[in-house]
Regions:
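Short amphipathic alpha-helical surface micro-motifs
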Residues: 52-60, 103-104, 111-113, 141-145, ...
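N-terminal glycine/threonine-rich, aromatic-flanked beta-hairpin/loop signature
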Residues: 88-141
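A mature extracytoplasmic/lumenal domain signature
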Residues: 80-83, 127, 132-134, 145, ...
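Amphipathic/hydrophobic helical signal segments and adjacent flexible N-terminal regions
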Residues: 2-8, 14, 22-77, 81-103, ...
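Short, hydrophobic/aromatic-rich segments at coil-to-beta transitions
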Residues: 75, 124-129, 156-160
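A charged, solvent-exposed segment within the mature domains of Sec-exported extracytoplasmic proteins
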Residues: 141-216
Length: 228
């Protein structure tokens, strides 16, 4: 896919989950897509189990619903600078404790995954602003449906897509969100993929710039990531 960046030599992105990036096996288009106490307690556990399954990429098509851009409203910061300056080292070490990669291997993996020169993203209404050290670009975006992605591992993800309707010429024609949710709900972090080729963006599996609320400190982000 094209790697041309709307902001200098920006690396473009595509599909994936937050903590792992399984190889993409294929994708499928979708929509442009009574007693209380004990029973309630069991119901709560059932809902928790379902939410966890969805987070891991296991869900029914019937559970998927369109989402508005307002789910990602706000000011967001890239994780990439925190990886580069060592703030995320405790996270890399924690992943190594329960996985088959060393902390150094994890850091190299995420160095590719998080890589981007877009340090800030602001989403207000239907307007998205991309800020890097060298440029600020703004576009107005409208929903262009969603795509269901199937990974080699067998789990799936839903990519929510928005198309530019007006704005700076160099602002990307498409932006695609992935945040482990499949129905309307405010995001607490997300991967954002952007570029000018809608279909090609779905094939990228190595670079997935990841954003957390701009108001969080590096230490707060580390604590949140370690809690998952």
């Amino acid at each position: 896919m094209p790697r041309t960046s709307p902001l200098t030599a920006l690396t473009l992105a595509a599909a994936l989950a937050l903590s792992t990036s399984p190889a993409l096996a294929g994708s499928k288009s979708s929509d442009h897509g009574h007693s209380h106490s004990h029973d309630d307690h069991a119901h709560d556990h059932s809902q928790d189990d379902k939410a966890e399954a969805i987070y891991k990429g296991y869900f029914d098509d019937a559970d998927i619903a369109p989402r508005p851009l307002s789910d990602w409203q706000g000011e967001w910061q890239s994780l990439y600078p925190y990886l580069q300056d060592g703030t995320l080292d405790p996270v890399m070490a924690h992943k190594a404790e329960g996985g088959d990669k060393s902390a150094a291997d994890n850091r190299a993996y995420y160095d590719t995954g998080y890589a981007t020169d877009v340090d800030r993203i602001t989403i207000a209404g239907d307007t998205v602003t991309f800020t890097s050290a060298s440029a600020t670009l703004t576009g107005t975006y409208a929903s262009d449906g969603y795509e269901i992605l199937t990974y080699a591992k067998g789990n799936r993800g839903v990519r929510y897509i928005f198309a530019k309707t007006e704005g700076d010429a160099d602002a990307p024609a498409y932006i695609q969100f992935s945040d482990h949710r499949i129905a309307p709900e405010p995001a607490d972090h997300y991967h954002l993929y952007w570029g000018n080729d809608r279909a090609a963006l779905l094939d990228e599996v190595t670079n997935w710039p990841t954003y957390y609320p701009a108001g969080l400190s590096g230490a707060a982000i580390v604590a949140e990531m370690l809690a998952h």
